[in-house]
Amino acid sequence: MTTRYIFVTGGVVSSLGKGIAAASLAAILEARGLNVTIMKLDPYINVDPGTMSPTQHGEVFVTEDGAETDLDLGHYERFIRTKMNRRNNFTTGRIYEEVLRKERRGDYLGATIQVIPHITNAIKEKVLAGGEGHDVAIVEIGGTVGDIESLPFLESIRQLGVELGRDRTLFMHLTLVPFLGAAGEVKTKPTQHSVKELRSIGIAPDVLVCRGDRAIPANEKAKISLFCNVEERAVISLKDVDSIYKIPALLKAQGLDQLVTKRFGIDCKEADLAEWEKVVYQEANPVGEVTIGMVGKYIELPDAYKSVNEALKHAGLFNRVSVNIKYIDSQNVEAKGDEVLQGLDGILVPGGFGERGVEGKIMAAQFARENNLPYFGICLGMQVALIEFARHVAGLEGAHSTEFDKNTPHPVVGLITEWINEDGQVEERHEESDLGGTMRLGAQLCHLEEGTKAAAAYKSTTCVERHRHRYEVNNNYKERLEKAGLIFSGLSSDRSLVEMIELPNHPWFVAGQFHPEFTSTPRDGQPLFEGFVAAAYTYQKRDLED
């Protein structure tokens, strides 16, 4: 199979939406019957985002094979059916680490290691490997043209453009075309300068995607075409929209997919975007709404919970309701108590690390349990629910996780020292293990107990979900917690680790050690999120009736 490559760069400012644009183009090409994948090349020096602060970088998206990756890979999986893996995201740090390891082994036979050719060759090898087996590989380059960190990646794709030829490569550049209110017109000069910067390093863009708060007039498109040496039909206007799921239709309406397939000489069917039209319609026409309180510690940057936010919206689509997310700092719960939890239709406690705010999360779980308010716990959200139950129902005073209190009299949650990974191999950890890349990661099989809400949601006695954690339920307390009424509704593949808990006689008090948000998509949803939002809507209607 001959793979074609589309390289996506950005200019003028960061956060233009390269990832969304790349994913939307991929969705159209997939709708035309092509096998598409997307890669993200990140210019930072970290080996991966696994140990980066969520308030700086946003969430860490976990792939099926256990790679800790950029949140853009979540966008990719939500737009196309292809599952991402560790080949779909790599950083400058990863490249340098691998090149230096080869140098230490003597693989370069004493050569002087340089950015060109050694670093650029390593980048090209990864790009080509990531595209294998696909008709089209879209490669997004992180950062902005002109950033010093991006230069090795830009040089690498420039070389690939020469080596693979024009019939296998296409360069798509996103720029900003701002509207100046004082002048009453859009300004193309930033785009011209950005393209000039890109051309100065040897890359001539084939397509310009121009971002702005409004559609670009035809005369301005012609101006951009003239000054940037790009065909007028290849100047694409991408205005702000109220839903990212409208973007595939916007790009298709301007013929971007036809431009790509013609360039690559690919003969394929027309794109059918009926699934996306359905998503947009459902999003615009809810029959009700619910308010979900998300109790966390990284709420100053909602992107820290990007996949959770999107999964709640997807669940809203399947329940025909609009989901309003109220972000609640768990430290505010500690300071103000129940007053910050009023007026909610459900509480969700997402994953997280560290002691700060953990008692507020425990208080939120207690409030939901005692008031029959739908509760959904994810990863740490399951652990705090179990700690709360142990303290206040099972009578285990002072129960805690050893992550937060190593001297707790009842360590109901502790460090996992051994488990079976996705390949069936035994993995071991201890207190002194590195923080990076040492968690239980990736897709794991979970056995669900019949008759539980978990099994009912999945309509199955098994599920496969992705993990990212190093602490687990202490099995020494299982019997006592079960006697107090807690149901262990999900167990690991070898039934040695607790994966899910729930409460009987409660509208919805369900929690999982895994991260189901990573498998939610707007077209398919996710069973647990759908069940949670349905329970929240039912709770709201009953509350109004009362």
UniProtKB/Swiss-Prot annotation:
Keyword Magnesium: yes
Name used for this protein in its record: CTP synthase
Subunit and interaction comment: Homotetramer.
The organism of origin for this protein: Shewanella halifaxensis (strain HAW-EB4)
Residue span, Glutamine amidotransferase type-1 domain: 291-542
SUPFAM superfamilies: Class I glutamine amidotransferase-like, P-loop containing nucleoside triphosphate hydrolases
Gene Ontology terms for molecular function: ATP binding; CTP synthase activity; glutaminase activity; identical protein binding; metal ion binding
PANTHER family in the cross-refs: CTP SYNTHASE, CTP SYNTHASE-RELATED
Family as reported in the entry's similarity comment: Belongs to the CTP synthase family.
Amino acids binding UTP: 14, 187-192, 223
Chemical reaction(s) catalysed: UTP + L-glutamine + ATP + H2O = CTP + L-glutamate + ADP + phosphate + 2 H(+); L-glutamine + H2O = L-glutamate + NH4(+); UTP + NH4(+) + ATP = CTP + ADP + phosphate + 2 H(+)
Enzyme category, top tier: ligase
Keywords: ATP-binding, Glutamine amidotransferase, Ligase, Magnesium, Metal-binding, Nucleotide-binding, Pyrimidine biosynthesis
Catalytic residues of the enzyme: 379, 515, 517
Control of this protein's activity: Allosterically activated by GTP, when glutamine is the substrate; GTP has no effect on the reaction when ammonia is the substrate. The allosteric effector GTP functions by stabilizing the protein conformation that binds the tetrahedral intermediate(s) formed during glutamine hydrolysis. Inhibited by the product CTP, via allosteric rather than competitive inhibition.
Binding annotation for Mg(2+): 72, 140
Covalent S-S links between cysteines: none
NCBIfam families: PRK05380.1, PyrG
Record Pfam families: CTP_synth_N, GATase
Other comments on record: CTPSs have evolved a hybrid strategy for distinguishing between UTP and CTP. The overlapping regions of the product feedback inhibitory and substrate sites recognize a common feature in both compounds, the triphosphate moiety. To differentiate isosteric substrate and product pyrimidine rings, an additional pocket far from the expected kinase/ligase catalytic site, specifically recognizes the cytosine and ribose portions of the product inhibitor.
Residue numbers binding ATP: 15-20, 72, 239-241
An example Gene Ontology CC term for this record: cytosol
Annotated binding of L-glutamine, by residue: 352, 380-383, 403, 470
EC number(s) from the headed UniProt entry: 6.3.4.2
Transmembrane segments: none
Region named Amidoligase domain: 1-266
InterPro entries in the cross-refs: Class_I_gatase-like, CTP_synthase, CTP_synthase_N, GATASE, GATase1_CTP_Synthase, P-loop_NTPase
